[in-house]
Design a protein with these regions (language model features):
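Anionic ligand-binding catalytic core segments
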Residues: 1-93, 97-202
Length: 202
């Protein structure tokens, strides 16, 4: 594996358990259901434009099923904004899930990457933000609409954009490695954050 680049990620849907003291540990899978499954939508139609979930449906699902809807609605709002900032256009209905345990909660983000870094991949987002599929065309008003779709206060959308821009830019140096790709991706994300700030100042 020395000559192969890879990313190792610890799974959040596995719990290490022991049947009895002294016995070997085993992994137990936590029950998870992606939003397509939860909404009864075929995985073949995971993109909104193909009949897949919309963000409005995703927020409604959390209001209905989450054990902590106020928290999870904001977490999903943050996830949408974060994906927008980094250029992850592939955040479709199968990339958001519910975890079922003692409580039903929005699962942590997974399958997250900056698809905007790859010119051959689609420029259209998997789900519309406030009626807009193309991330470069998203304006501040679209985040107002996004917050309203979430059932949150209208100003929260734009406020969280500002806050997450600051967070992303502040954390970026911590993520840089010697791998050349990380520098290129970081530059792209920084550019996207800068353009977003400029739009909000207009």
């Amino acid at each position: 594996m020395e000559d192969i680049d890879y990313l190792l990620v610890q799974r959040y849907d596995r719990t290490s358990l022991k049947a009895a003291p002294g016995s070997p540990e085993h992994l137990e899978r936590e029950h998870q259901e992606d939003f397509c499954q939860a909404l009864g939508i075929s995985p073949d139609n995971k993109y909104q434009i193909e009949g897949g979930p919309s963000l409005q449906q995703c927020f409604a699902l959390l209001r209905e099923l989450s054990s902590a809807p106020v928290i999870d609605l904001q977490r999903l709002l943050d996830a949408v904004i974060f994906n927008f900032l980094i250029g992850n256009h592939d955040a479709h209905g199968k990339n958001f899930s519910l975890l079922y345990g003692r409580e039903t909660r929005l699962a942590p983000l997974y399958d997250v990457l900056s698809t905007a870094y790859y010119p051959e991949l689609a420029k259209k987002m998997a789900m519309k933000i406030g009626g807009e599929y193309i991330s470069d065309k998203v304006q501040p008003k679209h985040f107002d609409e996004l917050a309203e779709e979430a059932g949150l206060a209208k100003p929260m959308g734009k406020r969280r954009v500002w806050e997450l821009v600051e967070t992303v830019l502040a954390k970026m140096p911590d993520l840089l490695t010697e791998h050349s790709a990380t520098k290129a991706v970081a530059a792209l994300i920084q550019s996207r954050c800068t353009r977003t700030v400029e739009k909000f100042k207009e």
